[in-house]
Amino acid sequence: MSANSHPPNSKNVLCNAAAGAAAGVVAATFVCPLDVIKTRFQVHGLPKLGDANIKGSLIVGSLEQIFKREGMRGLYRGLSPTVMALLSNWAIYFTMYDQLKSFLCSNDHKLSVGANVLAASGAGAATTIATNPLWVVKTRLQTQGMRVGIVPYKSTFSALRRIAYEEGIRGLYSGLVPALAGISHVAIQFPTYEMIKVYLAKKGDKSVDNLNARDVAVASSIAKIFASTLTYPHEVVRARLQEQGHHSEKRYSGVRDCIKKVFEKDGFPGFYRGCATNLLRTTPAAVITFTSFEMVHRFLVTHIPSEQSSIL
């Protein structure tokens, strides 16, 4: 994945989709416990760690508390939909992103910053619409240990069926508006990532496609921290809207009402609730995702025969 674009073909589509899916699975498995904590912080606010046996930071204390109450299963609650969501998310995203870059590039195959932002935004919109139901299920599964008096969901597919039956399409696509607002995240992250890669390539006197894993890790971590810090508030709003279900008290009537109530209760810091945990989770996840994608993609490009050679 480079700032320059390559002509689209079935090999590129296959390599992008397969590498994106592999990267999503690896990242989801690695960061799931921190994702559970982040989601609960966003939805229910900071926990009260009154147990004298719980020591250390809020994050460590929350991990210990969840493990004590719900076991290892609690730390990996929602792993299945997280894997499914991230697998499909990155498979769709990297494929769409590459196709849109090819469509928007100039005659000399160069991509302007504006075109890069547009490609990232378009891929983000398509991915968000396609995967929103899985993110709703993930949020519900990760927080259902804290919801009293509600029959828990048994699995990802049973949750999808039940939400569709009880709440209809609105339930499956709850939180879609703030999720689409989150397109600004990838619109910032991916062009920033591309620009940092170009800078590192020039500094190391090599091509972007020949950057090593360390360079990719540096570029992806800086881009992720920058984009996450600027766009985090929409994640809080999205998580709160997705968490409230058919059987729970309807706390928010919509995006505007949610923003108003969060601000009234917690002020501006309320929109950054769980941000530190989120950065601890998303920065390594971004490094894992982008490094895995780049390495797997290079392997596939090298080993999968091109259309012309397969015909011959």
From Swiss-Prot:
Keyword Plastid annotated: yes
The UniProt activity regulation field reads: Inhibited by pyridoxal 5'-phosphate, bathophenanthroline, tannic acid, mersalyl, mercuric chloride, p-hydroxymercuribenzoate, p-hydroxymercuribenzoate sulfonate, bromocresol purple and N-ethylmaleimide.
- Location relative to the cell: Plastid, Chloroplast membrane
Q: Which UniProt keywords apply?
A: Antiport, Chloroplast, Membrane, Plastid, Repeat, Transmembrane, Transmembrane helix, Transport
Q: Which is one Pfam family of this protein?
A: Mito_carr
Q: In which tissues is it expressed?
A: Highly expressed in young leaf mesophyll cells, root tips and at the branches of adventitious roots. Low expression in all flower tissues and not detected in siliques and seeds.
Where the Solcar repeats fall, as residue ranges, is: 11-103, 111-199, 211-299
The UniProt entry, under InterPro entries, shows:
Mit_carrier, Mitochondrial_sb/sol_carrier, Mt_carrier_dom_sf, SLC25A32-like
A single Gene Ontology CC annotation of this entry is:
mitochondrion
Q: What PROSITE patterns does the record tag this protein with?
A: SOLCAR
Single GO molecular function:
antiporter activity
Q: Which GO terms describe its biological process?
A: NAD transport
Membrane-spanning segments: 17-37, 78-98, 117-137, 171-191, 216-232, 271-293
Q: Topologically, how does it sit relative to the membrane?
A: Multi-pass membrane protein
Superkingdom assignment: Eukaryota
Instruction: Output the SUPFAM superfamilies linked to this UniProt entry.
Output: Mitochondrial carrier
Say which family it is in. Answer: Belongs to the mitochondrial carrier (TC 2.A.29) family.
| UniProt cross-references to PANTHER family, sorted A to Z | MITOCHONDRIAL NICOTINAMIDE ADENINE DINUCLEOTIDE TRANSPORTER 1-RELATED-RELATED
Add the further remark from the entry: Appears to be a chloroplast envelope-located membrane protein lacking an N-terminal-located transit peptide.
**Protein task:** Mediates the NAD(+) import into chloroplast. Favors the NAD(+)(in)/ADP or AMP(out) antiport exchange, but is also able to catalyze a low unidirectional transport (uniport) of NAD(+).
Would you tell me the protein name for this molecule?
Answer: Nicotinamide adenine dinucleotide transporter 1, chloroplastic
What organism is listed for this UniProt entry? Arabidopsis thaliana
